[in-house]
Regions:
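Unchanged
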Residues: 46-70, 77-133
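Active-site neighborhoods and metal-handling regions in enzymes and metal-associated proteins
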Residues: 141-372
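Short beta-strand scaffold segments in enzyme catalytic cores
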Residues: 18-22, 362-363
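Acidic, metal-coordinating catalytic segment for phosphate/diphosphate chemistry
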Residues: 1-19
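Conserved Nudix-box catalytic region and its N-terminal flanking loop in Nudix hydrolases
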Residues: 23-62
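Short helix-loop capping/hinge motifs at secondary-structure junctions, enriched
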Residues: 28-29, 103-107, 252-253
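A generic structural micro-feature
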Residues: 12-14, 87-93, 218-220, 354
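Short glycine-rich loop/turn motifs
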Residues: 17-19, 28, 194-196
């Protein structure tokens, strides 16, 4: 029986193999050997004097024909027990990596017959006692990474709530938010290099692409409505989180029920209602289009309008901006076919100068939809 273990690090000299879990355009990348009818993740032996990450790059290129890709180490794995590459059964170590492949050459310089892109993991594995466990570990680490970067966004909103005061301008608020995101682990910002989209007052009705966004120098008053939309990332792992903040009598009002302005209170209550309706309505089989129609009808039935400049209500969380799919008309992708998606209705009362926004990332577990 083979035993697979995982380590953060070991002595470099122990690393004899590299396995590269790979994806391209949201699909798993697997290889089929010329002499087998099974599938495997690319990988292989380290050559003498070779840097282990170079081993991973070389094996990826040889076995998949990848020519444009990003690759990163995930962790160290070990296998104990006799197998085709370990006659003695002692513990052997390898580097587990992840690669996002952007382009293939179409030619393979290896014993592999072909490369296959799959929506689901294969049933017929070449190494059924090893590689499924490696992929399970990768998925566990990836989820932790998404949770951590999203947590940094949530903590940044809590930080700025305790910092905002009358007299501050929006440029200062943006700067503080972006600095806090970086302090909490983000290394960059995925949406047009802007970490915090900040609007106040009648600007909260503005819906604009990040490409055209310019932060105003508007000054916060004693009674103010502010929307902040955060887009941190670490590597190619995204966070996406937005909240509407109310300032009354010079203080941030934490409890929606304590907001004095009736219009602002109703707007934030509607955002809560929308997210509750999402959790009630959405299933893995619900298409993005069906959710689009249902939620837009729900918005109108409750006396509000959708302010989004594209008319959509959210998007999938991916690793490249151009790969996103949206909660929009015509998108027949099922919610359960993506790992994570955002729900971010930007709404207002008709003809009002104030807009409201609340954004979370959601994902499915066996029992239903969960907030990340």
């Amino acid at each position: 029986m083979l035993e697979v273990k995982f380590y953060d690090t070991v002595d470099d000299s122990l690393l004899k193999f590299a396995v590269i879990i790979s994806q391209s355009n949201g699909k798993w990348v697997f290889c089929k050997h010329k002499e087998r009818d099974t599938y495997e993740a690319p990988g292989g032996h380290r050559e003498v004097g070779e840097d282990i990450l170079e081993t991973a790059k070389r094996e990826l290129q040889e076995e998949t024909g990848a020519i444009q890709f990003n690759i990163k180490p995930i962790c160290v794995y070990s296998v104990t027990g006799k197998n085709s590459v370990n006659e003695n059964g002692e513990e052997t170590f390898g580097l587990l990596c992840f690669a996002e492949i952007r382009e293939f050459s179409g030619q393979l310089d290896s014993e592999m017959e072909k490369v296959v892109l799959m929506d689901e993991l294969p049933q017929n594995w070449t190494y059924p006692l090893i590689q499924p466990k490696l992929i399970e570990k990768y998925m566990q680490i990836e989820k932790q990474s998404y949770s951590q970067i999203q947590l940094s966004a949530k903590q940044t909103i809590e930080y700025i709530k305790n910092t905002i005061k009358p007299g501050m301008n929006l440029l200062e608020i943006r700067k503080l938010c972006e600095e806090k995101l970086l302090e909490l682990g983000a290394d960059s910002f995925w949406y047009w290099d802007v970490g915090a989209f900040v609007f106040a007052g009648d600007e909260t009705c503005v819906s604009v692409s990040g490409k055209q966004y310019v932060t105003s120098d508007r000054v916060i008053g004693n009674n103010e409505i502010i929307t902040i939309d955060l887009s941190p990332q670490v590597g190619n792992i995204w966070g996406d989180y937005a909240r509407t903040i109310i300032v009354e009598n010079g203080m941030v009002v934490e409890d929606i029920g304590l907001i004095e302005n009736p219009e602002w209170k109703s707007g934030l209550q509607m955002e809560e209602k929308l997210h509750a309706e999402l959790l009630r309505f959405a299933t893995k089989e619900t298409t993005f289009e069906k959710l689009y129609y249902h939620m837009n009808e729900f918005i109108v039935e409750n006396g509000f309008v959708n302010l989004d400049f594209m008319g959509n209500l959210g998007h999938s969380i991916v690793k490249t901006k151009g790969d996103r799919v949206y909660i929009e008309k015509g998108n027949m992708t099922k919610l359960g076919d993506v790992k994570y998606f955002t729900f971010e209705p930007h709404i207002a009362f008709p003809d009002s100068k104030y807009g409201y926004k609340k954004e979370n990332i959601y994902y499915f577990i066996e029992n239903g939809l969960m907030e990340l």
